[in-house]
Swiss-Prot record:
InterPro entries: Puta_zinc/iron-chelating_dom (IPR005358), UCP006173 (IPR008228). It comes from Rhodopseudomonas palustris (strain HaA2). PANTHER family: UPF0260 PROTEIN YCGN. The lineage of its organism: Bacteria, Pseudomonadati, Pseudomonadota, Alphaproteobacteria, Hyphomicrobiales. Pfam families: CxxCxxCC (PF03692). Belongs to the UPF0260 family. It comes from the Bacteria. This is UPF0260 protein RPB_3505.
Length: 170
């Protein structure tokens, strides 16, 4: 007797729709990162309101053109205040950008068309205008903490119009 063929679900292959954050393998977890590097921008917190302000100043390890860390494996040792994202903290980090794959999945939402897991192309995050490519004005080693206020920008906390589209613009 032959086995009854398994019915293919439209969810097959979309692990972020079927697994909890805690159930994901390390490779699956890492692949939720869309490569935008917005989380690698320096941020300021208003001590009175708790509001977070992004700057266009990158971490000293950020390659602003590649939108990647120069030393990802050792980032916590080299930058002690680098926040490692975990299934626990992505649910509470209010400064994660609205486009962040970790944030979207933690909130039970789907990934956007430009996310590499959807598009199959790591460049769509740049095509959609979501990444920091071309927008990092300096690194933290070039700007004093006292001067960070002069570098506050709003775009990292916003989703670009073309990124909101349901599918890749043609």
């Amino acid at each position: 007797m032959t086995a009854v063929p398994k019915k293919i679900s439209p969810q097959d292959g979309f692990f972020w729709k079927t697994k909890t954050l805690e159930e994901m393998s390390q490779a699956e977890w890492e692949s939720l990162c869309d490569g935008c590097a917005r989380c690698c921008l320096e941020k300021l917190e208003d001590e009175d309101s708790g509001r977070i302000y992004f700057t266009h100043v990158g971490c000293r390890l950020l390659d602003g053109d590649a939108c990647a860390c120069h030393d990802y494996a050792n980032r916590s040792e080299r930058v002690p205040d680098c926040v490692r994202l975990t299934p626990e903290n992505v649910r509470t980090l209010s400064w994660l950008p609205p486009s962040c794959g970790y944030r979207l999945v933690a909130e039970g939402r789907d990934l956007y068309w430009w996310h590499p897991l959807i598009s199959g192309d790591p460049n769509t995050v740049h095509d959609a205008g979501v990444s920091v490519r071309g927008r990092v004005e300096a690194t933290e080693t070039e700007v004093s903490v006292e001067d960070l206020e002069d570098h506050i920008v709003s775009w990292p906390a916003l989703l670009p119009r073309r990124a909101k589209l349901k599918k890749r613009p043609g």
